[in-house]
């Protein structure tokens, strides 16, 4: 066996070149989940999408890791064709071809999605995706070179936020509209760690770099556009790294435990540089960590476990409870015979009482003179107006809650339809453990949440451990079991029963045990 591991890298464009609108590329089943006003949006490519290939071979183990600028892998059926880019049979078909053409075991192939999702169609057609990836693998294998590898961490805590808002009533909130500030308990944490794999040629020149970070790719294109085909901020960071490291360096991104993590710039809709700012800031933080990493010879090991996760069975009861709440909220709006302000009446009244709470209706001398005379008419007028303002605001709050509930009902119905269509109580999943020196990546076909990512790191006997989410398939969100009763977005947008978590931790522990041997 050679003293040094050998590596090969390559990348190839896989961007959709079709013209048309969202309406042209969405199935009828998918369209019912998309607001009608979006269907006329044109497909526009703002920046290219790539498949990137990293091959590692230490003489006894060979691993092929493919990263793709796409929302998810093999997600058509499970998303009702909303995430239509990657066919259900993409993974088995690709692995079969890799085994046939390159004699590399399919189980040693990992495909990870970046999770960019600005447009409903991102990639070239199914056959072209596989053919181009095979071409990229061939190129990587033809350019294998001895390398040294090091692993380390970067730190970036200023550009992401956990989007789950914990409420004082024990629930979780994510969906718009935003809740009243006085009802908020706090935010869940982020993981600021950036996992960094540094791969150098034997002469010390950069060969490749891999970074792992939790984010959600919701910013849009570097040009400042939303809804266009784009690699989002990941494309900016990868380009930044490649330009700064120079030569023929290829950079790779692996999605972390980012299921509940958003970019903090996501609400800055007027900042057209937000994607560039995010990607550049993250790239700078990666390079800070990269410079501290010491490289050397390493060995690689891979462990693959095939398991089954149970589907949730509580959706019908969940929908029933939400509909009962909707009925009660609707009944609360029945204010027959009561005086109700129109918006035209409400807005000027609200502004008056917000701008000058002490003297809203008249100049202050009128209030002072009324007090001297014992005249309560102005106070009574203010009390009536404040009551009308409160009634109007209460109705808005009620309708906001009804909007959230309708969104939840819609999502839950969609997932129940998927579960019914699949027709089995469980769904298969593949979990991989890839050990590169003292670094271990745990892959998962779900959008893993931050708390689960923290737990995996705590469980690990290895110095550096990272989650590579949305790999080798797609099973939507995977929240901790304790979150289900809190009813947050990731729980609502979830197919899996709470028991998935213990199953996952058990298989991860088994992987760690095998990798230690």
Positions of predicted regions on the chain:
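Non-catalytic substrate/cofactor recognition surfaces at enzyme active-site rims
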Residues: 1-517
């Amino acid at each position: 066996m050679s003293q040094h591991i050998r590596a090969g890298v390559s990348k190839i464009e896989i961007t959709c070149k079709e013209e048309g609108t969202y309406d042209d590329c969405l199935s009828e089943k998918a369209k019912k989940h998309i607001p009608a006003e979006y269907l006329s949006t044109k497909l526009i490519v703002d920046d290219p999408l790539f498949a990137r290939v990293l091959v590692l071979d230490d003489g006894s183990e060979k691993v092929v890791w493919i990263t793709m600028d796409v929302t998810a892998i093999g997600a058509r059926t499970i998303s009702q064709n909303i995430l239509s880019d990657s066919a259900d049979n993409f993974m088995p078909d690709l692995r079969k071809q890799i085994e046939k053409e390159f004699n590399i075991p399919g189980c040693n192939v990992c495909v990870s999605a970046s999770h960019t999702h600005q447009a409903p169609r991102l990639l070239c057609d199914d056959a072209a995706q596989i053919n181009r990836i095979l071409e990229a693998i061939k190129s990587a294998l033809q350019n294998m070179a001895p390398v040294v590898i090091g692993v380390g961490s970067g730190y970036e805590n200023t550009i992401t936020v956990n989007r789950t808002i914990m409420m004082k009533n024990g629930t979780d909130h994510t969906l718009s509209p935003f809740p009243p500030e006085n009802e908020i308990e706090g935010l869940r944490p982020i993981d600021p760690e950036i996992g960094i794999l540094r791969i150098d040629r034997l002469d010390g020149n950069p060969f490749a770099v891999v970074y792992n970070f939790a984010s959600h790719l919701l910013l849009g294109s570097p040009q400042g556009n939303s809804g266009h085909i784009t690699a989002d901020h990941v494309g900016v960071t990868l380009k930044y790294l490649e330009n700064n490291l120079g030569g023929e360096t290829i950079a790779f991104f692996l999605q972390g435990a980012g299921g509940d993590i958003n970019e903090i710039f996501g609400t800055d809709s007027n900042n057209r540089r937000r994607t560039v700012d995010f990607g550049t800031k993250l790239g700078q933080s990666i390079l800070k960590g990269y410079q501290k990493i010491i490289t050397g010879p390493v060995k690689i090991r891979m462990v693959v476990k095939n398991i089954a996760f149970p589907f949730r069975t509580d959706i019908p009861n969940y929908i029933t409870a939400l509909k009962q709440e909707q009925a009660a909220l609707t009944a609360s709006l029945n204010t027959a015979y009561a005086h109700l302000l129109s918006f035209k009446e409400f807005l000027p009244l609200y502004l008056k009482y917000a701008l000058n709470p002490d003297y809203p209706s008249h100049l202050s001398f009128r209030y002072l003179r009324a007090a001297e005379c014992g005249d309560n008419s102005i106070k009574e007028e203010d009390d009536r107006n404040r009551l009308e303002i409160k009634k109007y605001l209460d109705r808005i709050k009620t309708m906001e809650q009804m909007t959230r509930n309708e969104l939840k009902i819609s999502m839950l119905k969609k997932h129940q339809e998927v579960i019914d269509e699949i027709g089995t109580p469980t769904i298969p999943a593949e979990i991989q453990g890839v050990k590169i020196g003292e670094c271990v990546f745990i892959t998962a076909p779900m959008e893993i949440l931050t708390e689960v990512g923290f737990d995996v790191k705590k469980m690990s006997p290895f110095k550096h451990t990272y989650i590579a989410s949305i790999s080798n398939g797609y099973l939507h969100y995977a929240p901790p079991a304790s979150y289900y009763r809190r009813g947050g977005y990731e729980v609502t947008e979830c197919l899996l029963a709470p028991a998935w978590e213990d199953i996952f931790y058990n298989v991860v522990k088994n992987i760690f045990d095998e990798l230690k041997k």
